[in-house]
Amino acid sequence: MSSKLVLVLNCGSSSLKFAIINPENGEEFLSGLAECFNLPEARLKWKMDGQKHEAALGAGAAHSEALNFIVNTILAEKPELSQQIAAIGHRIVHGGEKFTKSVVITDEVIKGIEAAIPFAPLHNPAHLIGIEEARKAFPHLINKMVAVFDTAFHQTMPEEAYLYALPYSLYKDHSIRRYGAHGTSHFFVSREAAKMLNKPVDELNVITCHLGNGGSVSAIVNGKCVDTSMGLTPLEGLVMGTRSGDIDPAIVFHLHDTLGMSVEDINKLLTKESGLLGLTEVTSDCRYVEDNYETKADAKRAMDVYCHRLAKYIGSYCALMEGRLDAIIFTGGIGENAAMVRELSLKKLALLGFEVDHQRNLDARFGKSGTITTDNSRLAVVIPTNEELVIAQDASRLTA
């Protein structure tokens, strides 16, 4: 076992994902999820030594109780594992314009994360709680904590990509611009694609599609992000599990003025009640949509809108590739497993030279990477993402 393992923490508003990883080879020694915070059924599930475990955290438990359980119960049984933790990596959803790369966490960095709260009001406060509680639980690692930002990879976007056509003062005075998300995933799969294609990263032109409950597409030219589908917040862009993605902004005024909805209700509608859930009126789960595509009108409707939007984004990003596209990459829970989403979306891009190989597409699921197009087609591939490994590697590198 390496003496330089990294504890990776991803703190959400009502959950905490964690893993202990060897940054050199990606081996996981512990992984788990604490969920249902502040509810009677608060619990923690984890996997260690190939065994799955679950425990109740107690009614109303949250980040503090979860981290205490990890330290005082799980790791107490494995002191040799605890002693190997040399750094802690924190996933941070929004770094604003301040953070263009991962950084060691200082009081100044914490202020920067606080300043970006308006752009990630659910996520950033939870990340700050996670940092505070981790400092208490691991006092000897206070100077060995690293923040890895979902927005950092997109900070190479040019002004024409990140500016909205709003009064320029809103950008200058209030930092209202496009930031993107899922940057760690887009970074990872683009680097894996460079290895797969045997190309230097700085010569790589790819379009990466991170499709999960949230989803985004990025245009990567010469290894750098030049555009991405999410905007000021993760609400812009693709159809998602419960998020609408792109809409006519005037719909907001219509919902308020004509239907009498409050701003809070509209926010909830667009972020929690739209997307696949809104289109099916049944579920946000893409597996339902795929399984029932041929037999249920709601599933077909949702799938068709989802793939139409995805194909539009991929097609538009082809215009940014400076004359050469090396591959389209699918990743994330849907991108890695939903063969139908990939096939229906790529069929719409036949003009660009894409032809799906049905069997290859079916084979590239459940954690398997691979080409999903025919030998005569422009290339599309599936690459499973590993954001935790990127976070672990950055934490290890910056605290060495």
UniProtKB/Swiss-Prot annotation:
CDD domains: ASKHA_NBD_AcK_PK
Alphabetical GO biological process terms: acetate metabolic process; acetyl-CoA biosynthetic process
Main enzyme class: transferase
Residues annotated as binding ATP: K17, H210, L211, G212, N213, G214, D285, C286, R287, G333, I334, G335, E336, N337
Site (Transition state stabilizer): H182, R243
Pfam families found in the cross-reference section: Acetate_kinase
Positions of substrate binding: R91
Cofactor(s) it depends on: Mg(2+); Mn(2+)
Subunit structure, interactors included: Homodimer.
PANTHER family: ACETATE KINASE (PTHR21060:SF21)
Protein name stated in the entry: Acetate kinase
Organism: Proteus mirabilis (strain HI4320)
